[in-house]
């Protein structure tokens, strides 16, 4: 989103829950491997819960006619956790996966799967914040590479032995609920294939130029014309079933597909749709396909702004490309000029300070480069300045920080540039239960000649809290699924599509507003390239988050 005027911003405090980050493999597959626990005997498990949290176990019918075990919990208005744990000594092969059946009637609290050593000090886990618990029995599987060292004094990060297993519901949104478990299994797997992902390409209609998308030569391309009755298709064959994390495409000039779908197949005959793009903007397209596995990928081109298309490159990306939303953003940031994404996504250490009232229920953050996180775990507002036909971001200025009068809890960030100075100040007012965050942007011409400036304020789907933060409040990605812009009223409503949106009020009416989905072009790139959509097209947009 672009707001093209210096403005003070007021954020009404409305609850917003960060969208679930889910990176698990789910499939309706039959039981496999060694059964560790069928959840038939409740006495094998014990409840683990923090103070003032209520929890109990309850036997219920299982997925396949046997028994299962439900954890009924109530957070009683306090923070904490509830879970079930049992002794289960395990030694691990070189590669493996856990699987279990799950269903629940629960708010979107965090689901944690923990493996604990004999001393109880070292813990490995899979943590799924804001988990969307399915109402029906659903197969869940976690592979070895998805199990991380959570904490513990032992420097060994590879899990070789554990003594206990635990399922935990961690308070993210609170409330009460029931989560049921059945059929916990462990399956040895073949060694992972870490060889490069090499694909051969073919096209329908047949085209000799199809091979150009895999030749790493930007001067060649698969080219053709769109046909609504028989859409052109490109098929990539990996030679055998492989795991991968996404797809990157490089289009040529004005000939690109703005609408296309991505499908996968294990046998080359039956296809499953995994992604559809409806408003692509050409250039570089990054398509996240987390935790995918297939031999064939098919790209069906449905249309574009020109009669024809030219696809210069189609590359299947490894699992790490989009293992998590934060990994995906980091992959895109790596391929983008420094400054278009926050430091934390480029491996740099960012610094920030908190903004809030004493004892407040919610707090914001302001980062060293002037971005402001409106509330804990929420999206952020980032400044850009356009002058002399260029867009200047944090990487193009010298930034310093200060407190009001040297000690008051009113932080400011100062941008110094040969053509201007920008001061960003944030503070909060109100009481503990009802507080507001304010921001002031002051843009100054520091030269001797008159100039035209645009101050652009971008709502971006990540926190100031960096992606390296993984405990308590995981940092990084904070999706914006819905934007409603009212330029006349000076308000922006932004949310994840499931929880009440946060409202941003501009005290000075902007000269223009604009919004776009990630598929239509990341907003920093659009600003830098002068491709901002008109305000008439931006009154409302869905899926403004990074598409994951």
Where are the model-predicted features located?
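Extracellular beta-strand elements of beta-rich domains used
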Residues: 39, 142, 165, 182-186, ...
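Disordered, acidic Ser/Thr/Pro-rich linker "stalks" and the adjacent N-terminal cap
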Residues: 61-63, 72, 188-244, 250-260, ...
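Noncatalytic modules at the cell exterior or secretory-pathway interfaces
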Residues: 159-166, 291-302
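Extracellular carbohydrate-recognition regions
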Residues: 32-52, 188-205
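Short carbohydrate-recognition loop motifs
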Residues: 57-80
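Terminal accessory carbohydrate-recognition/targeting modules of carbohydrate-active enzymes
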Residues: 212, 317-548
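Short beta-strand-plus-loop segments that form exposed binding edges in beta-rich domains
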Residues: 167-174, 300-307
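Extracellular ligand-binding interfaces
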Residues: 75-154, 170, 174-180, 248-277
